Each structure stands twice: as structure tokens, then as C-alpha cells.
Design a protein with these regions (language model features):
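Acidic two-metal-ion nuclease catalytic site recognized across multiple nuclease folds
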Residues: 173
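Nucleotide and nucleotide-moiety/phosphate-recognizing core
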Residues: 1-122, 130, 135-141, 149-162, ...
Length: 173
């Protein structure tokens, strides 16, 4: 791509900052941000600013992908037997309202709740039960969309504009 999408600015804020502020506003601090290399901490940290409670986690396998990063997070003892809100910088319009709605709508028997835009699910914005989802994804490298659809889950239908996935500045045009 050539440019780090986390640092693409929308309305004067980097996409990583927008994601972190939305999570913090939804009372989801500390926010754990996985980075590929130590230099990313300084660069992303300066884009986010010092006011949020951020825990930086270095990927054990550089650029391994979201499934490995999620599995690694779920293996952390601090994440066991609880809830974890997944979020990526790819969704700059995901707001605290979305995260609150996911919290409110998660069913008692659900392993997760996934936002849906009417055409497809968005697993990287799911609210997950850590123990159950670890059992689902551990060692399975099929797409998360497939794995999560097979799990006991709820769907939160959301405005497609909120779930617009941005990977390059051209996606904003």
C-alpha cells in the first residue's frame, strides 16, 4: 500500500486515534494495541496522544494477521474468562455508540456479537467472550467471518456508512 493506514487522517485525526478515542469513550480502557515493531509504539503513540490508557503489545510473529493477533491476545492471562472488544483502525467511523450497542445486545448464551451492514458481517469489530472464542479460533486459519458465523452469536445490524472499511486514502473518495 505504501502508507500506513493507521496514520491516514480523517477530519484532522489519524485513524488509530479515532479508534482509540471511540473505545475509551465506551469505557473500554485499557486499550491494547498490537504493533508489528517497537518503532510503531512511538509513531502511533504520538498520533493518539498521552491521555488514553494504552497497553502496547508487540506481535510475536510480525505481520502474521488478525487471527494470530487475536489468538495471542486471548492467550494472555489478563484476557481469560471475560469480554474483549475487537477493533481495528480500518473502521474510522466505528463510534462508542456502536461499542455500547454491542455490549447491550450480547446474548447470555452468545460466544460473540458481530456488527453486520446488511450484506456482510464485520468480525474485526465483534465483542467476544474470550474463553469461548479462543476454543473456536485456536489453530483454525479459516476466515474469521466463517468461524464466527459458525459460533453461537448475535448480529447487530448497523448503518453501512459506519462500517465502511478504509485501507487506503482512495477508499475515502
Amino acid at each position: 500500500m505504501g502508507r500506513d493506514k493507521a496514520l491516514i487522517e480523517i477530519d484532522g485525526s489519524a485513524m488509530i486515534e479515532r479508534a482509540a478515542i471511540s473505545l475509551a469513550t465506551a469505557n473500554l480502557e485499557p486499550i491494547r494495541i498490537a504493533v508489528a515493531q517497537p518503532e510503531d509504539v512511538e509513531e502511533y503513540g504520538s498520533a493518539i496522544g498521552p491521555d488514553l490508557d494504552i497497553e502496547w503489545v508487540l506481535d510475536s510473529i510480525t505481520h502474521a494477521g488478525p487471527i494470530d493477533a487475536i489468538e495471542e491476545a486471548l492467550l494472555d492471562p489478563e484476557c481469560e474468562d471475560g469480554l474483549l472488544q475487537l477493533a481495528t483502525v480500518d473502521y474510522p467511523w466505528a463510534s462508542s455508540d456502536l461499542f455500547f450497542s454491542l455490549q447491550d445486545m450480547l446474548g447470555a448464551d452468545d460466544c460473540l456479537i458481530m456488527p453486520h451492514d446488511g450484506e456482510r458481517g464485520h468480525p474485526l469489530l465483534s465483542l467476544i467472550r474470550t474463553k469461548e472464542v479462543l476454543e473456536i479460533i485456536e489453530g483454525d486459519r479459516r476466515p474469521l467471518r466463517v468461524q464466527f458465523a459458525e459460533a453461537r452469536h448475535s448480529v447487530l445490524v448497523e448503518d453501512p456508512a459506519i462500517l465502511l472499511n478504509v485501507n487506503t486514502p482512495a477508499d475515502l473518495e
